[in-house]
From Swiss-Prot:
InterPro entries: DUF1444. Belongs to the UPF0354 family. Pfam families: DUF1444. It comes from the Bacteria. NCBIfam families: PRK13668.1. It comes from Bacillus cereus (strain ATCC 14579 / DSM 31 / CCUG 7414 / JCM 2152 / NBRC 15305 / NCIMB 9373 / NCTC 2599 / NRRL B-3711). This is UPF0354 protein BC_4690.
Amino acid sequence: MKMTSKKMKDELIKKLSRPEWDFQYDSEKEVLRIEQKDSKKGINVSLPGVVAKWEVNKEKAIEEVAYYVQEALIAMHKEENSGAKILPVIRSTSFPKQAEEGNPFIMTDHTAETRIYYALDSNKTYRLIDERLLQKLELTEQQVREMALFNARSLGYEFKQDTVAGNTFYFLNTNDGYDATRILNESLLQSMREKISGDMVVAVPHQDVLIIADIVNEIGYDIIAQMTMKFFAEGHVPITSLSFVYEDGEFEPIFILAKNRKKTDGKEKG
């Protein structure tokens, strides 16, 4: 049987059919939206991607996508009823891993320098989610991650821009406590990548700033290094003084690239 986006849509609707959920199919974009009838919150599933997974894993691919959608929608419903939002926050890898002895935080690896934690935000205060709080919330770690990333994508962004020696720097500083969190918004990163002509360099020196730079020369690398160090030193919640080159969805710390460059230069001289 040849699988198509339309057939995949039918398979997913069959798996996810519940009286409290609605389905909308955009045949032009090949996207299936599953949302809660009451809140209209939901998830968009790009069907060509699922079809590609099906070509390799067959039924398992459908089961996997259906499971993640179901987990995320259930978690959203619980979050809505609790009156608090769950959002990811970026922290240094040196940040404590436990709230107290025997009670670890819920965490996800991010880069060599950063780690993702999860915050329960009730507008006035927020608390990092640890295992005990997770049990009280009656959520799984996967539900927390899905919900947090969904909420991160809904955070607005408006950059200030500055150009120095041909290099363009974009600054996000809303002071909502989640500026660095925007680094997890893939669609934001991709849209910036499309407008950048040189190397795309990203920095989160502290939690209240995100810097994205279009670096076209060595001066640009010097400027971003100095800038990141300055912001890191001034930050209320410092994260990392290193910046990263962003390419193909991956973050590479600049000092690693510099080391590799030196090794290459050394070989050429030899």
